[in-house]
Amino acid sequence: MELSQLEQRLEVLEGRVAFQEVTIEELNQTVVAHQRDISRLQEQLRLLSDKLREQNTSIIASQSEETPPPHY
């Protein structure tokens, strides 16, 4: 192979590597953003679950809080 052909091939490979580096960085930023979203959604789910659990326990009265039936 001639030197000019090798230089052309090298330039093509360098261009591909540069493109891949940009793509990898963009993908990394996307993954980081998704992880932030997942963490935020997990926290919201935890808060909603806690709130629902609190509401369920407050709806059901304990035996001592129940008024006796009318025939007592």
Curated annotation (Swiss-Prot):
InterPro entries to which the protein is assigned, alphabetical: SlyX
- Pfam families from the UniProt entry: SlyX (PF04102)
NCBIfam families listed in its UniProt record: PRK02793.1
Query: What family is reported?
Result: Belongs to the SlyX family.
Record's protein name: Protein SlyX
Q: What is the lineage of its organism?
A: Bacteria, Pseudomonadati, Pseudomonadota, Gammaproteobacteria, Enterobacterales
